[in-house]
């Protein structure tokens, strides 16, 4: 009789993680059968998708409100089928708003639950820990400091490392990356990453471009490179660029990269850069794994500030840092210019230091290398081991 594992992943990053976990599960239990909501990476590992992953994908609060009836229907169908089929364990991958609610219902019905990718309770809404304690039999976390938080709260937890640490090279090759991007090996290169969402680009791109103008006043030969995830985002960015022109700026999408098509275009740009001006988010971790000096920035719209303040109920976050590299190093290793501090002048000054201070760059490289080594684990094997222990009643 095969071992049945229920799973729900709600976005591409979760699909990628879950696909690798299913591979790890098959190595430990070849007859395992995984089913629920997932995407192509999971299905490539034999996953049975009751609903496609994109059925859970929403873009912002307005889209979420429009999709409430559909999401509630999918939630109800998934819950009923999980309760009927009673898998040996359920694994929710990220998507906490959907998965924690489902995990609570399943756990109350006697189905053990595992949640992979802990919600960012360390940044805001720490009170969610109570919901997690009730809903989750075992947490799988990507960062070592998260393990400490859950251990302190008495929640079973396993630190499994971050999958990106096994994909991004320990020793990046700047010259090879510049060759792929047709950049001169000897020129000074600033990567500009204003985010992947339209709202982020609208808010951050004007500030980042004005900072680039100030930097080019200091160094007219400075090359600025902006990766864009798709042509639509590129068009949105180029509309803003027309208002804040930067001499020689290159806006790059995947088709502009020679070879290495499987690698995200942003990774090639990070690897090629001397320094990076980057929106807070996963891109800061990717930049750190490429060992590049960076300046982290983020600006919420006034409307979003009010929503976040209402939802968090906190005047300050649980940790004093926002950028993942600083959170991991427990130090302001790289500058964070947020909200009213994210002025073109301050961004330009911090970016100039990142571009020109070689001693600082060497220190950053050493610290980020140590961080990379700490995050490098056999994530699929560790996650699969913990899930199988929960499924067999040992977790």
From Swiss-Prot:
Catalytic activity: a lipid X + a UDP-2-N,3-O-bis[(3R)-3-hydroxyacyl]-alpha-D-glucosamine = a lipid A disaccharide + UDP + H(+)
Known pathway: Bacterial outer membrane biogenesis; LPS lipid A biosynthesis
Key words, A-Z: Glycosyltransferase, Lipid A biosynthesis, Lipid biosynthesis, Lipid metabolism, Transferase
Enzyme category, top tier: transferase
GO CC terms in record: membrane
The keyword DNA-binding is annotated on this UniProt entry: no
GO MF assignments: lipid-A-disaccharide synthase activity; phospholipid binding
GO biological process: lipid A biosynthetic process
The UniProt record lists the keyword Lipid metabolism: yes
Assigned EC number: 2.4.1.182
Its biological purpose: Condensation of UDP-2,3-diacylglucosamine and 2,3-diacylglucosamine-1-phosphate to form lipid A disaccharide, a precursor of lipid A, a phosphorylated glycolipid that anchors the lipopolysaccharide to the outer membrane of the cell.
Homology family: Belongs to the LpxB family.
Listed name of the protein: Lipid-A-disaccharide synthase
Organism: Bordetella avium (strain 197N)
Name of the gene encoding the protein in the UniProt record: lpxB
């Amino acid at each position: 009789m095969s071992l049945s594992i229920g799973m729900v992943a709600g976005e591409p990053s979760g699909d990628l993680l879950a696909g690798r976990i299913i591979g790890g599960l098959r190595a430990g239990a070849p007859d395992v059968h995984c089913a629920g909501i997932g995407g192509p990476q999971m299905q490539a590992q034999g996953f049975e998708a009751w609903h496609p992953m994109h059925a859970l994908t929403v873009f912002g609060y307005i889209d979420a409100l429009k999709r409430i009836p559909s999401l509630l229907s999918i939630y109800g169908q998934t819950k009923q089928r999980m309760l009927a089929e009673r898998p040996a364990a359920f694994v929710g991958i990220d998507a906490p708003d959907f998965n924690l609610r489902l995990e609570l219902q399943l756990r109350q019905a006697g189905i053990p639950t595992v949640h992979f990718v802990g919600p960012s309770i360390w940044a805001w809404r720490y009170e969610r820990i109570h919901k997690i304690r009730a809903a989750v039999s075992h947490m799988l976390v990507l960062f070592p400091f998260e393990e400490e938080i859950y251990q302190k709260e008495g929640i079973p937890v396993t630190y499994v490392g971050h999958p990106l640490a096994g994909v991004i090279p320990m020793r990046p090759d700047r010259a090879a990356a510049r060759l792929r991007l047709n950049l001169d090996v000897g020129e000074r290169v600033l990567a500009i990453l204003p985010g992947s969402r339209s709202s982020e680009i609208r808010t951050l791109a004007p500030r980042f471009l004005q900072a680039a103008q100030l930097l080019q006043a200091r160094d007219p030969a400075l090359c600025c490179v902006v990766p864009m995830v798709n042509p639509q985002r590129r068009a949105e960015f180029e509309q803003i660029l027309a208002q804040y022109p930067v001499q020689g700026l290159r806006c790059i999408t995947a088709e502009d990269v020679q070879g290495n098509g499987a690698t995200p275009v942003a990774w090639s740009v990070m690897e090629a850069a001397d320094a990076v001006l980057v929106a807070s988010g996963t891109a800061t971790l990717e930049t750190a794994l490429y060992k590049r000096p960076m300046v982290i920035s983020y600006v919420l719209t006034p409307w979003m500030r009010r929503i976040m303040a209402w939802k968090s109920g906190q005047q300050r976050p649980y940790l004093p840092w926002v950028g993942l590299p600083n959170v991991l190093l427990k130090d302001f290793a790289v500058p964070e210019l947020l909200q009213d501090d994210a002025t073109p002048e301050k961004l330009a000054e911090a970016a100039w230091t990142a571009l020109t201070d070689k001693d600082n760059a060497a220190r950053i490289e050493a610290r980020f290398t140590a961080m990379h080594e700490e995050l490098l684990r056999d994530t699929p094997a560790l996650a699969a081991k913990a899930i199988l222990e929960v499924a067999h009643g040992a977790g």
